């Protein structure tokens, strides 16, 4: 499972011109589900994201987590994080999970955020969306649940 995580001062997502999710201070999480992903991947990423110390403390050092600052999450599905661009110019998405598996694990990640006491807003799974954000910092991180198995 892959996530692009952006620290934001505000963000919202629109579907067909209607705002369906909006947050203030927090993290915009673009979440992609791969064919090999499982519930453990969803739980791992949700825990990791909630506990990332990417918010500034009183000395302006990145030392506070989402929970520490009372931040929110805007969770948006993003299967294109599994794009393979090695051959030709048209991306292949063969490594992305099929829609039913992707939706199930996206919803598992959503539930994992909620279980940690985080307020979560969402886009609409599978819809064409417009995501608006004010990236604070800017701070943008790429996380891949497979990385947890690689040696440091």
Swiss-Prot record:
Catalytic activity: glycyl-tRNA(Ala) + H2O = tRNA(Ala) + glycine + H(+); a D-aminoacyl-tRNA + H2O = a tRNA + a D-alpha-amino acid + H(+)
Pfam families from the UniProt entry: Tyr_Deacylase (PF02580)
SUPFAM superfamilies in UniProt: DTD-like (SSF69500)
GO MF term list: D-tyrosyl-tRNA(Tyr) deacylase activity; Gly-tRNA(Ala) deacylase activity; Ser(Gly)-tRNA(Ala) hydrolase activity; tRNA binding
Residue positions of motif Gly-cisPro motif, important for rejection of L-amino acids: 137-138
GO (cellular component) term, any one: cytoplasm
UniProt-listed Enzyme Commission number(s): 3.1.1.96
Keyword tags: Cytoplasm, Hydrolase, RNA-binding, tRNA-binding
Chief location of this protein within or outside the cell: cytoplasm
InterPro entries, per database record: Daa-tRNA_deacyls_DTD, DTD-like_sf
Location of the protein in the cell: Cytoplasm
Domain of life: Bacteria
GO annotation terms (biological process): D-amino acid catabolic process
Class of the enzyme per the UniProt entry, highest EC level: hydrolase
Record's function text: An aminoacyl-tRNA editing enzyme that deacylates mischarged D-aminoacyl-tRNAs. Also deacylates mischarged glycyl-tRNA(Ala), protecting cells against glycine mischarging by AlaRS. Acts via tRNA-based rather than protein-based catalysis; rejects L-amino acids rather than detecting D-amino acids in the active site. By recycling D-aminoacyl-tRNA to D-amino acids and free tRNA molecules, this enzyme counteracts the toxicity associated with the formation of D-aminoacyl-tRNA entities in vivo and helps enforce protein L-homochirality.
Family per similarity comment: Belongs to the DTD family.
Domain comment, as recorded: A Gly-cisPro motif from one monomer fits into the active site of the other monomer to allow specific chiral rejection of L-amino acids.
Quaternary context: Homodimer.
Name of this chain's protein: D-aminoacyl-tRNA deacylase
Organism expressing this protein natively: Thermus thermophilus (strain ATCC 27634 / DSM 579 / HB8)
């Amino acid at each position: 499972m892959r996530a692009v995580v952006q620290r934001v001062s505000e963000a919202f997502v629109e579907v067909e011109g209607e705002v369906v999710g909006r947050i203030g201070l927090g993290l915009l999480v673009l979440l992609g589900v791969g064919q090999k992903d499982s519930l453990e991947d969803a739980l791992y990423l949700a825990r990791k994201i909630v506990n990332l110390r990417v918010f500034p403390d009183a000395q302006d050092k990145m030392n506070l987590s989402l929970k520490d600052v009372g931040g929110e999450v805007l969770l948006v599905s993003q299967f294109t994080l599994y794009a393979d661009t090695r051959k030709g110019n048209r991306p292949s998405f063969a490594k992305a999970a099929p829609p039913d598996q992707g939706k199930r694990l996206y919803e598992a990640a959503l539930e994992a955020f909620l279980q940690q006491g985080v307020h979560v807003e969402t886009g609409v799974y599978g819809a064409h969306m417009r995501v608006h954000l004010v990236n604070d910092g800017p701070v943008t991180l790429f996380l891949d649940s497979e990385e947890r198995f690689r040696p440091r």
